[in-house]
């Protein structure tokens, strides 16, 4: 198949990670694959040389044009690609990219699959969404969701043509040897960004540290530039916690840096289906996670069986759960061992095959009209 993915850029984030994994896998399997982006960022995921990257965003000469003109040009450039290259299908990831792709597809005959990657409540319920969803979503050939909670937000006509597919993880997170001895570390991975509520995690760990002063907290993740990093740095400095609360920065080697930790702590207030959480579970880490909307953690964690779920924004519950996993190592290892079973079901190849079968069905349905 000739497959195109559309999103803003490939800067390290959840949707970008999924697109890079899927594109690389499809290309490896012999499909002709394009990634259509609006711009390039500094900290991007790597894509295979077999994947063709195409710029469909604004050109330098467009910078001085008005806002409406810029919007129309972005639609025009994407429409031109669809018209000229005639991909079998375009998969659009994330909010504005979805609207652009659905608009740009008019008159091309190219089916568009929408991929919602976040909690729709708060992201698809603004006044303009209430206009664009009924106007544009009927044009979608299909819709991919990560959780039931995401799907339930949308009207019946969207749900009817949708499917739930989990995110793929890189094979490097599979079959990582179990540590002979766990380090006295609590870890988290993910961008430093407001909705991940890392301040709450740090505040919870400050309480943990009073009881377990030999443990440290390491947070791996790039700066999202929204001010969260500065808030975290101030919180660490204010509590004189520099020796045991550490911001490690972004990393491409988490499969080497995370597995020996005693606890993986996930603190988000809302998410779609968090890739970082899937990776931690697949590594066999004992996990405590907030039961955040729209149900991502609950989709993959059965509390008390392969991890522990706690309420969002609840420092006390997070503190208690981390302490439990530190103190009851038998429970922690049992949870981690069960968590590891998730990995084989969400490999890049298995998830790509689910996407491929869904795409084939959509293409066949379109041709049979």
Which functions belong to the PLM regions below?
Residues 5-13, 17-19, 25-65, 153-155, ...:
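N-terminal strand-loop element at the rim of the active site
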Residues 286-291:
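Short hydrophobic beta-strand element within catalytic cores of glycosyltransferases
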């Amino acid at each position: 198949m000739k497959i195109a993915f559309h999103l803003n850029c490939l800067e390290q984030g959840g949707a970008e990670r999924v697109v890079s994994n899927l594109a690389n896998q499809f290309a490896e399997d012999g499909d002709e694959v394009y990634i259509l982006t609006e711009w390039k960022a500094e900290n991007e995921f790597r894509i295979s040389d077999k994947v063709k990257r195409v710029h469909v965003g604004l050109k330098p000469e467009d910078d001085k044009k008005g806002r409406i003109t810029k919007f129309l040009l972005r639609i025009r450039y994407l429409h031109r690609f669809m018209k000229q290259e005639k991909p079998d299908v375009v998969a659009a990831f994330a909010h504005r990219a979805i609207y652009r792709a659905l608009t740009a597809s008019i008159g091309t005959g190219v089916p568009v699959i929408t991929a919602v990657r976040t909690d729709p409540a708060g992201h698809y319920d603004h006044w303009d969404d209430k206009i664009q969803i009924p106007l544009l979503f009927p044009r979608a050939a299909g819709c991919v969701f990560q959780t039931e909670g995401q799907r339930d937000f949308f009207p019946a006509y969207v749900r009817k043509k949708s499917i739930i597919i989990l995110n793929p993880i890189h094979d490097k997170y599979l079959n990582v040897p179990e540590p002979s001895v766990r380090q006295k570390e609590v870890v988290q991975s993910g961008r430093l960004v407001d909705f991940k509520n890392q301040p709450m995690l740090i505040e919870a760990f400050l309480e943990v540290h009073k009881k377990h002063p030999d443990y440290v907290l390491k947070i791996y993740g790039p700066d999202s530039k929204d001010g969260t990093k500065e808030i975290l740095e101030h919180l660490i400095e204010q509590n004189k916690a520099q020796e045991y609360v550490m911001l490690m920065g972004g990393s491409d080697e988490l499969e080497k840096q995370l597995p020996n930790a005693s606890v993986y702590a996930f603190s988000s207030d809302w998410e779609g289906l968090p890739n970082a959480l899937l990776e931690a579970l697949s590594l066999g880490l004992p996990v405590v996670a907030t039961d955040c909307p729209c149900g991502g953690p609950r989709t993959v964690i059965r509390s008390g069986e392969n991890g522990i779920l706690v309420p969002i924004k609840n420092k006390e519950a997070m503190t208690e759960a981390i302490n439990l996993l530190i103190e009851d190592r038998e429970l922690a290892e049992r949870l981690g061992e069960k968590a590891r079973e998730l990995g084989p079901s969400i490999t890049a190849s298995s998830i790509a095959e689910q996407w491929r079968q869904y795409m084939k069905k959509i293409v066949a349905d379109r041709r049979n009209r």
